[in-house]
A protein has these predicted regions:
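C-terminal alpha-helical "lid/dimerization" subdomain adjacent to the S-adenosyl-L-methionine
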Residues: 86-141
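Conserved SAM-binding strand-loop segment of SAM-dependent methyltransferases
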Residues: 30-42
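Conserved SAM/SAH-binding beta-strand->alpha-helix loop
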Residues: 16-18
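A short glycine-rich, Lys/Arg-flanked "PGG" loop and its adjoining helix->strand segment in the class I
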Residues: 67-79
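Conserved SAM-binding motif I beta-strand of class I
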Residues: 9-14
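A short acidic, Gly/Pro-enriched loop at the edge of an enzyme's catalytic core
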Residues: 43-54
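A short SAM/SAH-binding and catalytic strip from SAM-dependent methyltransferases
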Residues: 52-66
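Conserved small/polar residues in nucleotide/adenosyl-binding loops
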Residues: 149-151
Length: 151
């Protein structure tokens, strides 16, 4: 995004110091001067800045504190700002996922990675198949208006 939009500035955060270091190295290799990365818990974003646009990809369900993460994102968005949250398209109800094209994979990955990561930190353990219904509830409770949901 930094190279595609040189007149914009980008900040990335990750819980993992290693991931942040890799991102910083990649940005330096690409000679990007409009990007920066910080090690932070997304449930407690520490910045005085407000953002026009925030993105998360396949991330909310892995968090130890997903509700706090979503609330933290809402807090740092400018009024009228947008959050693009891309996640696996599923239902929050197991029975509605029986014919899901990658349902078995989603539940397996959840047990072996997503939930394990979250639960290791005393988290909620949503998993990849947390579903649209639960996402809507979490997002609206944080204050988001859901103007577009593509499922």
């Amino acid at each position: 995004m930094g190279s595609a939009f040189p007149n914009s500035s980008f900040i990335g955060i990750d819980f993992s110091t290693e991931a942040v270091n890799v991102a910083l190295t990649e940005a330096e290799a690409m000679s990007l001067t409009n990007v920066d990365f910080y090690q932070q818990d997304a449930a407690e974003i520490e910045t005085s800045e407000k953002f026009d646009f925030i993105t998360t990809f396949d991330a909310v369900h892995d968090q130890a504190r997903p509700r706090e993460m979503v609330a933290s994102i809402f807090k740092v968005l400018k009024p009228g700002g947008y959050w693009l949250c891309a996640d696996l398209c599923a239902s929050s109800h197991l029975g509605e996922n029986l014919d899901h094209p990658i349902g078995t994979f989603g539940y397996t990955v959840s047990c072996m990675h997503c939930m394990s990561v979250s639960l290791a930190y005393g988290g909620e353990g949503l998993g990849a198949m947390w579903g649209a219904q639960q996402a809507r509830e979490i997002f609206t409770n944080a204050g988001f208006l859901l103007s577009l949901i593509h499922i």
